[in-house]
């Protein structure tokens, strides 16, 4: 029988988020991927340190790697500390990797990490998106829509 989940750990705890990704790209599909980390990287992430703002994922030799993500060295670590900007392997099923390879090569899409979080079982996961880049006009449209939503909310708050 499965262990009951404590209510505090029932939801995911986000430790790093790529906020610009939703502005820079059209998000087509999202996936959850495991990530290979060393012990000091896990400890550093549990303290809420880490950044994926400039990172991306790429497929190499049938494996998916998270490139340019920054997990700072663990403050209480010793000589066994990790390298902060090393490429980290993402754990996905072969079928998903094949889909990513096809989409990136044929359709000109990009693999963008949206967030790193710990799931209810305490495992580090990466929310990965298959995305297509926006041009300047699309970005302006996004800004206009966002501003209109804010203005509409402000009007509704003031008048009713």
UniProtKB/Swiss-Prot annotation:
<dbReference type="InterPro" id="IPR023620">
    <property type="entry name" value="SmpB"/>
</dbReference>
<comment type="function">
    <text>Required for rescue of stalled ribosomes mediated by trans-translation. Binds to transfer-messenger RNA (tmRNA), required for stable association of tmRNA with ribosomes. tmRNA and SmpB together mimic tRNA shape, replacing the anticodon stem-loop with SmpB. tmRNA is encoded by the ssrA gene; the 2 termini fold to resemble tRNA(Ala) and it encodes a 'tag peptide', a short internal open reading frame. During trans-translation Ala-aminoacylated tmRNA acts like a tRNA, entering the A-site of stalled ribosomes, displacing the stalled mRNA.</text>
</comment>
<dbReference type="Pfam" id="PF01668">
    <property type="entry name" value="SmpB"/>
</dbReference>
<protein>
    <recommendedName>
        <fullName>SsrA-binding protein</fullName>
    </recommendedName>
</protein>
<keyword id="KW-0694">RNA-binding</keyword>
<dbReference type="InterPro" id="IPR020081">
    <property type="entry name" value="SsrA-bd_prot_CS"/>
</dbReference>
<dbReference type="GO" id="GO:0003723">
    <property type="term" value="F:RNA binding"/>
</dbReference>
<dbReference type="InterPro" id="IPR000037">
    <property type="entry name" value="SsrA-bd_prot"/>
</dbReference>
<keyword id="KW-0963">Cytoplasm</keyword>
<dbReference type="GO" id="GO:0070929">
    <property type="term" value="P:trans-translation"/>
</dbReference>
<comment type="similarity">
    <text>Belongs to the SmpB family.</text>
</comment>
<dbReference type="GO" id="GO:0005829">
    <property type="term" value="C:cytosol"/>
</dbReference>
